[in-house]
Amino acid sequence: MGIKRYKPTSPGRRGMTVSDFAEITKFEPEKSLTEPLKKHAGRNNHGHITTRHRGGGHKRRYRLIDFKRKKFDIPAKVAGIEYDPNRSANIALLHYTDGEKRYIIAPLGLKVGDTLMAGPNAEIRVGNALPLANIPIGSQIHNIELTPGRGGQLVRSAGNTAQLMAREGNYATVRLPSGEMRMVHIKCMATLGQVGNVDHQNIMIGKAGRSRWLGRRPVVRGSAMNPVDHPHGGGEGRAPTGMNPKTKWGKPAMGKKTRHNPRTQRFIVRTRKQK
């Protein structure tokens, strides 16, 4: 993938970059693998905002992605690489020899015409999915399950990759992109290779309107609000907050640990903060 730059014909164009979509080979989605995607603008079933700064954006259809890769020992040919508006990674359309079609996250280096397979007996090559018990130590992997059969939950966004570091007993140790070292059951599936579309992180949005196309609404600083709206609000002119950073609801912000899951804490060998 390459980056396309625009001439500075306007302040919004200056610095704006887009993907050149060189990897994309198919421009219309497989209709049988899509479904309507209703917009909620960050609201829950009561109509209350639970996620701020969401709303608007271009209409989308959801692409049904196969995160489980449970069609074992059935070869599939890559029919196309497509853009997916619902995620940063591109997706690949697979045509299985039994006639079924499925989408997967497109790994780096996958090309149209490649043959992929999933299962314990699959070949060690990019795009194939195997249990962690059957993947060589040191391999780059993505789309990693946390619970066997549940489907990939970790390392799914553009350019990301994890590394299989060790295996001991029923657990494998995986180094995640954040630097965290985590134990995952060896029956969990993972896909070989790195997620494609690696230049996604280098794209410059360029102007506010382009964020609105993506469904992102403006973010207002607390210090620019009134005291009734935010703990940082009020004062004459640009006033200091006079306190440790707080959220809009008075909770500690910036640096406060928010992880509260002691059940899975024992699976974390090293946190992302430890060196």
Curated annotation (Swiss-Prot):
Belongs to the universal ribosomal protein uL2 family. This is Large ribosomal subunit protein uL2. Part of the 50S ribosomal subunit. Forms a bridge to the 30S subunit in the 70S ribosome. GO terms for biological process: cytoplasmic translation. Keywords: Ribonucleoprotein, Ribosomal protein, RNA-binding, rRNA-binding. Residues 39-59, 254-275 have a biased composition (Basic residues). GO terms for molecular function: rRNA binding; structural constituent of ribosome; transferase activity. Residues 38-59, 222-275 are annotated as: Disordered. One of the primary rRNA binding proteins. Required for association of the 30S and 50S subunits to form the 70S ribosome, for tRNA binding and peptide bond formation. It has been suggested to have peptidyltransferase activity; this is somewhat controversial. Makes several contacts with the 16S rRNA in the 70S ribosome. InterPro entries: NA-bd_OB-fold, Rib_uL2_dom2, Ribosomal_uL2, Ribosomal_uL2_bac/org-type, Ribosomal_uL2_C, Ribosomal_uL2_CS, Ribosomal_uL2_dom3, Ribosomal_uL2_RNA-bd_dom. GO terms for cellular component: large ribosomal subunit. It comes from the Bacteria. It comes from Herpetosiphon aurantiacus (strain ATCC 23779 / DSM 785 / 114-95).
